[in-house]
């Protein structure tokens, strides 16, 4: 057995609210690295106001003036990974890499900040993403959650240092760098 069973009081996941609720107040903007709210125009902000918590945007429920793109004048597409409002009581879905592909904040009419998305990916607040905003979105979206990497590394170290049995190792493991 290489893991500990969770205690009965432990949730199997952390909710969005547990992870980012303390970042919603405007006084936190600029206090943390990469925590500046996106500058959406009034039409986009109003469009976000029609998205229910935990739901994607339903174009059919939008007023006519919000059904067309403010820059293109063409009908708005429903990109479910972009026009999706997080649910405070549930875990976040996968953060999709790409420009402006971050989901909508659960209570505010804006997309997540880079810091909020990074917190969901379990990056420590001290970690700074650099470059243009599009690159920062890509860095967060392409990242493997830090806590998963840490847990895997901890388990591998335990197995290799304490419980490695060369006789039971697979052929692949014997050909790897773990066995000399």
What function would you assign to each model-found segment?
Residues 26, 30-180:
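C-terminal target-recognition/interaction regions appended to catalytic cores
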Residues 1-34:
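Flexible, glycine-/basic-rich loop-and-beta segments that form/coincide
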């Amino acid at each position: 057995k290489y893991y500990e069973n969770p205690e009965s009081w432990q949730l199997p996941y952390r909710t969005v609210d547990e992870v980012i609720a303390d970042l919603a107040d405007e006084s936190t903007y600029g206090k943390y690295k990469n925590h500046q709210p996106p500058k959406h125009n009034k039409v986009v902000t109003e469009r976000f106001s029609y998205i229910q918590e935990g739901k994607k945007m339903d174009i059919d429920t939008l007023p006519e003036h919000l059904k067309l793109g403010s820059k293109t004048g063409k009908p708005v597409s429903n990109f479910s990974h972009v026009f999706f409002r997080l649910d405070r009581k549930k875990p976040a879905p996968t953060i999709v890499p790409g420009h402006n592909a971050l989901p909508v904040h659960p209570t505010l009419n804006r997309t997540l900040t880079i810091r909020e998305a990074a917190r969901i990916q379990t990056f420590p607040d001290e970690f700074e993403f650099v470059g243009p905003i599009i690159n920062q979105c890509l860095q967060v979206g392409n990242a493997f959650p830090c806590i998963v990497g840490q847990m895997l590394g901890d388990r591998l170290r335990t197995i290799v240092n304490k419980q490695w049995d060369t006789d039971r190792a697979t052929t692949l493991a014997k050909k790897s760098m773990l066995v000399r």
